[in-house]
């Protein structure tokens, strides 16, 4: 089984270089990782994409990802319109209820990141759970949220993650377990992240499935200029 950590930030804004992150991820047993940038401009996204392409190798896959931080729904849709066709994985930073809702209502989003952040609830309700399932939007279990929290805050985060796993089991939306790492020292091995998933209510098989390549190949096919729709491409001949 090929396993991927789909939410990692190298320097900048992370603390470790992309090369160091990749080297450490290899040693931990990953098949590939997604390196994320914040799409503050087209220049940043293009530069990030080139860096990722240069880092790919036959024995280790590196995936282009962006993490959108939007204050309004309009800002979110503008970023999606601008950058969805330039990257392989789109992550939307959650927390705000309106952003959470907008993110799961479009199939242009791959992952909603820590929807429970800074909230008194899990960030996902039953209506949003159905939308996430319909649009194949993964709800993230971000290990860094646990790693960098303490006492009551950590207890609340874990409880909210458990609630989202219950919703995932009931409504069938996908889950993405990620390290959320900003440093190579925040990376964890596939088995460790799978164990984290089990600790918040996932079955072991489902936890490992959440680490698989899944959407990557589908999205790479969509980025092909000849792609029209699933199963349909335009032949150059």
Go through each PLM region and give its residues.
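Charged catalytic cores and adjacent phosphate/nucleic-acid-binding surfaces used
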Residues: 1-35, 40-58, 74-81, 85-86, ...
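Short active-site oxyanion
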Residues: 88-90
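A glycine-rich, hydrophobic loop/mini-helix early in the fold
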Residues: 61-79, 93-96
């Amino acid at each position: 089984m090929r396993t991927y950590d789909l939410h990692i930030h190298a320097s900048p804004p992370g603390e470790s270089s992309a090369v160091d992150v990749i080297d450490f991820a290899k040693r931990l047993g990953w098949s590939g990782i997604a390196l994320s940038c914040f799409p503050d401009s087209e220049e940043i996204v293009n530069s990030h994409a080139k860096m990722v392409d240069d880092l790919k190798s036959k024995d280790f896959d590196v995936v282009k990802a962006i993490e959108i931080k939007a204050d309004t729904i309009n800002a979110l849709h503008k970023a999606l319109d601008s950058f969805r066709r330039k990257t392989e994985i789109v992550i939307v930073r959650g927390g705000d209820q309106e952003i959470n809702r907008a993110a799961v209502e479009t199939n242009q989003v791959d992952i909603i990141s820590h929807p429970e952040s800074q909230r008194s609830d899990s960030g996902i309700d039953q209506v949003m759970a159905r939308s996430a399932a319909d649009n194949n939007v993964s709800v993230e279990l971000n290990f860094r949220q646990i790693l960098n929290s303490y006492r009551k805050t950590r207890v609340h985060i874990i409880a909210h993650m458990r609630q989202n796993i219950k919703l995932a089991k009931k409504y069938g939306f996908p889950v993405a377990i990620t390290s959320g790492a900003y440093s190579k020292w925040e990376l964890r091995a596939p088995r460790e992240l799978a164990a984290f998933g089990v600790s918040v209510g996932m079955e072991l098989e489902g936890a490992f499935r959440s680490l698989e390549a899944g959407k990557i190949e589908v999205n790479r096919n969509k980025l092909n200029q000849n792609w029209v729709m699933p199963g349909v491409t335009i032949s150059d001949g």
